[in-house]
Structure formats: C-alpha cells, structure tokens
Amino acid sequence: MGQQVGRVGEAPGLQQPQPRGIRGSSAARPSGRRRDPAGRTTETGFNIFTQHDHFASCVEDGFEGDKTGGSSPEALHRPYGCDVEPQALNEAIRWSSKENLLGATESDPNLFVALYDFVASGDNTLSITKGEKLRVLGYNQNGEWSEVRSKNGQGWVPSNYITPVNSLEKHSWYHGPVSRSAAEYLLSSLINGSFLVRESESSPGQLSISLRYEGRVYHYRINTTADGKVYVTAESRFSTLAELVHHHSTVADGLVTTLHYPAPKCNKPTVYGVSPIHDKWEMERTDITMKHKLGGGQYGEVYVGVWKKYSLTVAVKTLKEDTMEVEEFLKEAAVMKEIKHPNLVQLLGVCTLEPPFYIVTEYMPYGNLLDYLRECNREEVTAVVLLYMATQISSAMEYLEKKNFIHRDLAARNCLVGENHVVKVADFGLSRLMTGDTYTAHAGAKFPIKWTAPESLAYNTFSIKSDVWAFGVLLWEIATYGMSPYPGIDLSQVYDLLEKGYRMEQPEGCPPKVYELMRACWKWSPADRPSFAETHQAFETMFHDSSISEEVAEELGRAASSSSVVPYLPRLPILPSKTRTLKKQVENKENIEGAQDATENSASSLAPGFIRGAQASSGSPALPRKQRDKSPSSLLEDAKETCFTRDRKGGFFSSFMKKRNAPTPPKRSSSFREMENQPHKKYELTGNFSSVASLQHADGFSFTPAQQEANLVPPKCYGGSFAQRNLCNDDGGGGGGSGTAGGGWSGITGFFTPRLIKKTLGLRAGKPTASDDTSKPFPRSNSTSSMSSGLPEQDRMAMTLPRNCQRSKLQLERTVSTSSQPEENVDRANDMLPKKSEESAAPSRERPKAKLLPRGATALPLRTPSGDLAITEKDPPGVGVAGVAAAPKGKEKNGGARLGMAGVPEDGEQPGWPSPAKAAPVLPTTHNHKVPVLISPTLKHTPADVQLIGTDSQGNKFKLLSEHQVTSSGDKDRPRRVKPKCAPPPPPVMRLLQHPSICSDPTEEPTALTAGQSTSETQEGGKKAALGAVPISGKAGRPVMPPPQVPLPTSSISPAKMANGTAGTKVALRKTKQAAEKISADKISKEALLECADLLSSALTEPVPNSQLVDTGHQLLDYCSGYVDCIPQTRNKFAFREAVSKLELSLQELQVSSAAAGVPGTNPVLNNLLSCVQEISDVVQR
C-alpha cells in the first residue's frame, strides 16, 4: 500500500499531517446516514449555532458507528433530517451542518474527521465523505498521503483532506491561514452576517474574525489573555474559540452584527501527487491521451490531455525539436519538483525517454491571466477580485523567495486562472535555484524587455529583486485589465526612458496605495525595492480603514454605494477623499483591525508621478498622458518623497520600506534606440501648454516648466542634453545642452525626442516639401536627444528653456532652422569630434545670416568630447567657441539670464559622455538654422560690414548684425537665446581639431592650442561670460556651438569655474598634427577588438608612459565605435555602450592625470581603466 514512515496504532504520539490548505469545498452535502434523534421545531429567527443542547447527552460508544445513540462529532457534521421545517433545512444545508460548539472534546488523538469529499482513483486509495470520522494508521514517505480506516474500509487519502477531530479546522467557519484580501473575496458575494475565522498569513498565530455587513467586510482581532482565554471585547472572555463564536452568534457584543452564516470553503486544497505510491516522475506516454491545443511558446506547445489511469484532465507541455537541450528541459521539470504551493502550478510527471518530450502539469480551466483579464466581465471581476488575484501571486512569489528561487519571467501571460478566481504562477522555463545573490544568464538568452529590470537588461544579472520589478509590471497589468505595459513606447525606448526616471503612470481607478507599491517595485536600485514578504504584508495592511472598492470608487469619482465597482472607468472627476467611519455604531472600535489607523487618511496623500489628464489619442505616446498633478498648486520639493505619498504616516508601505532615494541612473554615451527612421515626417506645435503644472519625477529627476504670462509665447521643448540638477539653484549659471542651467527645465532637455514630442506637446505630422525629399535624419547626439529631419516650409521650431525657475520669467522664442545634410562617408555613427573631409563638404545652400553673435573667450577642457567644435585658421584674436547666450526679449531692463560655458555643469555632475561612434560634421560658410542666434530688435538697415556691440544689464557684450542679413523666415524682431543644437554639415575647407581616437599614428602627440579671450566683467562678482564667435573668412558668420562638455577631472580647474568662465582660465586644446585615417569597416571584427583590448590590458600591467596608454586606449575606442553596430542583441548593446563610455571617461582621467605611470593596484586611474577594458571584453564575448 505504499511506503510508510510509521505505523500508528493505539499510541498517543500520532504523527501530525502536513499543513492544511486554506480553502475547502463549497456547501456541505446532505448525508442520509442517520436521522436527527430528536426532532425540533425551528422558529423564524433560526440560527445554526443555537441548537446544540441535545448533543451534550450524546456519548460516542464506538467508532464504527453502529450504535443507535451515535457519536457527537459525527452528529455534528450531518444535516438536519426531515423532521425539521423546510425553511430551516434549506438554511442549514446552505451554510453548513449544525456544529456542536459547546460539547465535550474527543480524547482519542488518532481520530480524524474528513474535511472534503474524496473519490478513490486506484492505487489503494479510499473514498471518503466530508464529516466522516477516520482513524489514521500511517503516512507515506513525504507525508502527503495518509493511510486511514473508516467504516467503509481501509486505504489512502490526501493528508490535507483530513484533520484531527478536536482541531479548529473541523469547523465550517474556520478557514485556516487566509489572507485579508482572500477573506474579503470569499465574503464579497455573501449576505449580511456572513463570517469566517482565519489565521493571518503575515502574522502566524494571530486569529481574526472577518464579518460582512452592508456591503463592507469588517475584520476583528481575537485577543488572547495570559491565562489562555480569548476575546474580542474585553468584557466577554472565553476558554475556547468555539465558545467565543457561539457567544457572538447570539449577541453582537461589540461587533457590527451577529455571526450568522459561516462562509463556505470554496476550494479543495491541492493534492501533491496523484497517488501515494507514485513517487517516480517518469510517465508512460501511452497513459496520456492528447486533446486540443491550448497554445504555443518559444520552446514548445501546450495541449489539454487526459491521464487515463486517474481520469484526470492535465496540461501537457511539449518540446520542439532542436529548440532546447534535453538537459534544459529537464531542469524546468526539476525546478517544478522542488516547489509545492497552492498558488504554483503543480508538476505531475515527465516523459523524457524518447522525443517528443512531455511535461505534465495540473490543468487550469480558465487559461492565462492576461487573456482572462481582457475577456472577463468587469462587473464580476471587481476590484476585490483583482486584489485577491494579486495577493495570491504575491504569496506564491514569497514562497519562491524563501526557497531561493527566481522566476525570471513573471508576467500575467505566465499566470493561470482556475475555479473561483484561483491564480497560480506557471511557466518555470527560466526559473533557477539561487546559490548566490545574483544569477547571470548565458549569452543569447532572451528576455521580455518591458518586464525585465534595468540591471538585467544591461548586465544579464538576475535576482529576486528583478522579479519584484516584474511583479510591479504585473500589478499594472492587473489594474488595467490586461493592457500592454508602456503603451505606445517602442522596445528600444524602454530602457532609455527608465534611465531618465520615467515610470508608467497611475492607471485609471487604481488606488494610490496600490500605485505606491508599483512605484516601490520600480525603484532603480534593486536594494531599494521591497521583498516579496514585504509586498505580501503590504496587501494585508493596505486597506485597514477602508475597502478597496471604496478606494476605487473615490478614484473614479463615484460614491461607494456598493462593492461591485468597476475599477477602470476613465475621465471621471476626482473627489476629495475623507476618513471613513463604520456605518453602524461599533462599541469595540479598539479591536477592529486597523482601528489605530482610523484617523489616517488613506487616500489623502496622492501618489506621485504624472496624474491623469485628457485622454491620449490612439497614437503612440512616449510620455505619460497624465501631465497634471492632482493638486495643481503643489510642488514636490524633495526628490526623496517622489516614490511615496507626502504623508509617510498614511502610507501603507512606510512601516518597513527603506527610506532611501533611488540612485541616479548611470549615464551612458548615447541612446540605445536607433536614429529616427522616418525622416520625412514633419512636426509643428498645435497644443497649448500654458497651464502645465510644476512636476517632479521620481529617482532624482526633476523639472519645472516656465510660468506662462499673457505676453509670452507658450513654452516649447527641443532635444538637448540630459543632466541632473538641483531644483531652483540660485546660482543660475549659463545654460547649455548638458544642463549647465541652474535648475528649471535644464534637467530634461534631452528627454524629448520627436517621437515623444509628437504625443505630449501636441505635435501633428505635416507633409514634407519637395526640397526635403533627399534630406536625411541627423544622428542622435551623445545626450540621447534627437531632432526630426525637417519641418514644413523647411522650418523647425526650437525651444530654449529657462535657466532658473526662481529668476525672472524668460520669454521663450521659437527659432527657425532647417534640416541639415549629415556628413557623408562616416562609418562610425557616434564620433562626436569633427573630421576633416574635403569630399564630404555639402553644397552651399542659401540660408539667412546670423543676426547676433556673442563675443567673448571660452575656457575649454582638454580634448573636448563634442563634435560641434571647430576653429578656423582665420579666427581673429578674442574669438573662440560660442557658448550659450541668454538674451530674452527686453533683457536690458529685465536683467536677462547669466551666461556660462555650454556643456559644463556647475555642480560637478557629468552629463552623458559621448560615444565615439557619432558623426558630428563641422560648419559650412553659410548660416545653418540649427544654430540659432540673437536678433537685435532695434538695428534695421545697418550695412553688413558694420559690427555693433550690444550689452545686457550684466555687462555681457554681443555682436549685433543688421536685420537685412536675415531672410524673411518669421519672427524677425525677436531676440533669440542661443542654444547648442545638432551639428551642421561640414564646410568645404577648414582646419579642425582632430579626435585622438581616429588618429592613425597612436604615438603622435598633439600640440596645444589656446583659445583667445575677450571678456567683460559682469555686475555680480567679476565673473566673465565665456562666449565666443567664429567669423568665417572675414564674413559675419554664425557662432560655432559646442555640444555638452565633460568637466575637467582636475583639482585645479573646478567645473563651476569653467562654467562661469573665471578670469584667467586658459585650457589647452589637444590638436593633432594631421588628419588620421579611420579603421576600415572590413578590419573591424570581434577578434581584432579583443586583440586590441588584450594589448591595452597587457600595457596596463607594465610601467609604460601615460601617453602610450592613452593612445592605445583611443585605438580601442576606435575599434569599439565601429563594432557597436555588429552587436545583434539590444541588451548586449546597452552594456557595451555603457562600458565604452566608462572607458572614454577613464582615458580622460588618465590623460589629465599628473600621477606617474604605474601598474594597476597602485594607481586608481589605471584600476578603473583596466576594469573598463575587462568589461568590454566580457560583453563582446557573450
């Protein structure tokens, strides 16, 4: 009869069965074994707990049940007979059989009672009926099956189908370990007075009463005194829990109503294993009858089948040939063998002796959760049901967490739905047993990008915290009834947006506390995310002083009049939340679970992030549709608060969450998305954004829009660099594309791309003109921004953003610009330095001349990383590289904004470092409208050769040109604020600064070039405006605009000094002797790159001069820039570009380092450089 651990005779030391399941079968079935010995007349107010007196005299004379007197436990579990009035009989059968709550207990420890019906299926199993008494004889090896003897015979039954006759589980009202959300789900469809007693899942041993009344479920803690008595109200204490339930079934005594009807146990517990002797996993293929196909996956297909031996419906997963190794397939089965949880799909067996291979699991009739949510009746699947589903998944993942398993593919499509909304996590194809903190996937592994954590995308490393990230996305799927995450956002954009702090917006009707949990799961740093134990606890404590139905109703602007509220109804007004009180006077408020939180406003603190606004169109929004804060006048001032509610006391998660701000995402060299592939689309502004409220995003990403005035043009955004800045910096230095501006919008200038602007700023696509047909999109800059290739009438509107949100409101003007032809014959897409190329010069095109040229010298760092920098041989003294000019309309009287060097953050933070693969052509002799200049509104009809100088209120001088030099292109009389843009086409002839990474001679040492200076004292402390302009061939040319620059890593020159152009600062520029040849594409290969990396690694281990190391490093960068496009997988490309960025920064540090050459271990700069080279090699070898 199977293997036994021990034989149980008359000895009192009975081995206890395994833990019971938390749910049982539905209503008790009538049994006609015996009639009630004493017929009774039942009155109208019938209560099943009031008819117990006659059971006290019933004494059990024997086990076999052949005595006429009968035993009290057996009588307790049979329904009323025909001598009871029909109404009373129907109620008794509906809610449960009559129970003896006050009778004597049994003294036989081996006497058990059946909790559920069980039908024998062979292998010496025994059929039992609910309420039947049994004597346990022993258990099988794993304790999952018990050998019992009843009056019908002897055999095996599941251990979790029986319980000791004196245990609490024999009572119909006791449900064992049940979560709070599961209790609300079980009671949600019942009537007033329905109740259950449960043990808290999060606090074992803590019992509670869950009672439904008037559409609300109330939870009462059952307290225990020192002498072992239990009570709900301190005045009424009892020796046993049964006495307590009997008391409150007759009088409310502090409860909202009396306990009338025990909630039925809806689901039988899971039976692990199909029989007591089936302990081998290999199955006979002929035992399975295959039926229809359910679906297919990456490695195989899933069918419905029947296990003929047990007449059991199963799910059969087959393996496609040549798609997975047999060992990998068996690993999935091995993982499933180790896990046993009510909310994890159970493995039944495998067929691996010959192909095709099978994995046989339990069958879930309602399919995957994703399709179920999309097709369900939302009036039936209410917010209570959704919360119940999420709690089950959280419980399953907490179990995996304790077992050190990671799932790696947690999503709604991989969860299955059964009867009574039971959800089980399935698809363990990627699951792994964790032996350390993280697991690194093998090369070529595929993962769903929108569900995968950022660290997993970048480094292929997985942990339980990466599953927590996926669980947050799964919550979002549940809250939206199966919507696809990141709607309208391409896969290539997801990491890019996440890195900048973007997170999905709060779904319509989603309670703020649930959204807080999502945002906590989406913390950038894995250490800052909660564990699954904490998320499970969060669901237990989420709605102490309210119900989720009421929260959803308030979110949707509806009165919480019923519990059946559809939690996803768009565009309803949001009503202010208020603290809810009980609908009936409750005398025992201190014992209601969560009563200590009754004074807290659970919904008063609004969830952070973007709040819902007008519905987005059916296009592809890459920014949230919710662009306005729920409290328009509120401005979040602390970035630490952006992931939680303003009031931490009211936040459900604050009791155990780490109060840490997520670290700033690492800045990469370039965007992970490819350049725009639709150059023909044009955009123009159509929206009005005068009422956009101040926003602050999570993870340290903050920005504040300019305030609109009646006479100001609505603000517009353009693609610049992304940099992180403190909000409202009073220093307000000059602003460049890399975030040198003192706060304000400067932190997000790189956040808007044409695809993003199209949806969020009301852009509409226009038709290209005939002259634009040949135009090509310009490669994206190193700051992850990009510009569209053209606009109607060859015009593009650009926006210059305010430098400081506390300074005077600056007028934002639109600047006319045309698309530029990208440099020809460029093999590397990210080379940010200009390249001398005679044949690459584009034909001159008629364009308006520059109107205002800022004058002044510029302090430039060594080896400037940008490509928009060029100095001609004919540059006059005092003319350097142009920075950024802040010159709003009326600047003389309003004070203007300070000028500073473009691209150098004042606070020392480095912007995104350029990748050595983007082409940045140099300037033509004709004016390019990508570089806006200032127009003097007062100078008209001035000869072209007359140079006039304008000075603002701070003493900054600007070169003014007459208006007739500008062709009519709109907005002639408005001054422009100069902002660095994407680089223009190359000129026919120019002497350029050559990037060392493209030098053919690595030993060549460039000479130094010092930019001339022409400075003017400012009125605020003698700081100088570091600005320069480059006239070309004596003509009135336009300023050369440098892109964002990385500050010097030296102690003598601070970024703040460079940004403000401190007097006397002169920084030498490296200039090569001659233009170098690029490495041809056919010479770039994986082997060549690894060989170059090994050469640099070898050089680092020997005492060689720094200059030699720098030259070797630049040669490696040259190979990397050409090899990046050869990497097929986006995830590996992410990590590769980030490693190249680190290498380039390390080379910059080494170049300016004054430390003597050494070996790694003694020089930290060399250590960093060696780690970067090793990281590049690792990524390439994946």
UniProtKB/Swiss-Prot annotation:
A lipid is attached at G2 (N-myristoyl glycine). ATP binds at residues 294-302, 317, 362-368. Its main location: cytoplasm. Transmembrane segments: none annotated. Belongs to the protein kinase superfamily. Tyr protein kinase family. ABL subfamily. Non-receptor tyrosine-protein kinase that plays an ABL1-overlapping role in key processes linked to cell growth and survival such as cytoskeleton remodeling in response to extracellular stimuli, cell motility and adhesion and receptor endocytosis. Coordinates actin remodeling through tyrosine phosphorylation of proteins controlling cytoskeleton dynamics like MYH10 (involved in movement); CTTN (involved in signaling); or TUBA1 and TUBB (microtubule subunits). Binds directly F-actin and regulates actin cytoskeletal structure through its F-actin-bundling activity. This is Tyrosine-protein kinase ABL2. It comes from Homo sapiens. The lineage of its organism: Eukaryota, Metazoa, Chordata, Craniata, Vertebrata. The gene is ABL2.
